[in-house]
């Protein structure tokens, strides 16, 4: 009798571990989105229609010197690719301000390292 309960306990434990592991994997995949449009050097749109502004950087606004190059660089990095989004908050333009990762590498840092964006330590979410 004790052996039967022991076997049932092990089987139930394995089942629960598999169930919860699969649930964690599903939850993790919810943070990944495909980039469908790059608006400028620090903003893009995902397959869900969400507008994302990359946290902690400031790229030239469209029409200013370097703006098209910054947009093109960001596009080459992430357009039509899956990125991980770690959301922070919405800004005054209703964009989600987020850290963005491509294959585990910070897109925020790549934009600054490339020279097409500057680090922005501003705590304000109103920064355009």
Set out the residue ranges of the language-model regions:
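Small beta-barrel nucleic-acid-binding modules, primarily SNase/OB-fold domains
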Residues: 2-128
């Amino acid at each position: 009798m004790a052996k039967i309960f022991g076997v049932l306990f092990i089987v139930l434990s394995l089942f629960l571990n598999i169930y919860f592991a699969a649930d964690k994997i599903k939850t993790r995949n919810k943070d990944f989105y495909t980039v469908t449009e790059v608006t400028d050097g620090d903003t893009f749109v995902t397959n869900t229609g969400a507008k994302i502004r990359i946290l902690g950087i400031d790229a030239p606004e469209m029409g200013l010197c370097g703006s098209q190059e910054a947009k093109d660089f960001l596009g080459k990095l992430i357009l039509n690719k899956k990125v991980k989004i770690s959301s922070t908050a919405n800004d005054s333009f209703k964009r989600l301000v987020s850290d963005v990762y491509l294959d585990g590498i910070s897109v925020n840092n790549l934009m600054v390292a490339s020279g097409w964006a500057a680090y922005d330590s501003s705590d304000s979410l109103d920064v355009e």
